[in-house]
Amino acid sequence: MSDKKVTITQVRSMIGCTKKQKATIKALGLRRPNNKVEKPDNPCTRGQIRVVQHLVKVEEQ
């Protein structure tokens, strides 16, 4: 197991997004713009980030 983490910041609103994108943002634990969460860096998290890459900013730690 790696201890790598990524910090995900929502930078754009979900207005006008598809249901899949809204569900992905909710699954990541984000609620509104400028909200941050820290998640483990694994393929599952990376896949979720790829779905909403235009709405979030990712920082690796």
Swiss-Prot record:
State how it assembles. Part of the 50S ribosomal subunit.
**Phylogenetic lineage:** Bacteria, Pseudomonadati, Chlorobiota, Chlorobiia, Chlorobiales
- The entry's protein name is Large ribosomal subunit protein uL30
Query: Where is it found, in Gene Ontology cellular component terms?
Result: cytosolic large ribosomal subunit
Gene Ontology biological process terms from the UniProt entry: translation
**Family membership:** Belongs to the universal ribosomal protein uL30 family.
Q: Which HAMAP family match?
A: Ribosomal_uL30_B
Q: Which Gene3D superfamilies does this one have? A: Ribosomal protein L30, ferredoxin-like fold domain (3.30.1390.20)
The source's domain of life comes to: Bacteria
Coiled-coil segments: none
UniProt keywords (A-Z) are: Ribonucleoprotein, Ribosomal protein
- Read off the SUPFAM superfamilies from this record: Ribosomal protein L30p/L7e
InterPro entries annotated for this entry?
Ribo_uL30_ferredoxin-like_sf, Ribosomal_uL30_bac-type, Ribosomal_uL30_ferredoxin-like
GO function term, MF aspect, one = structural constituent of ribosome
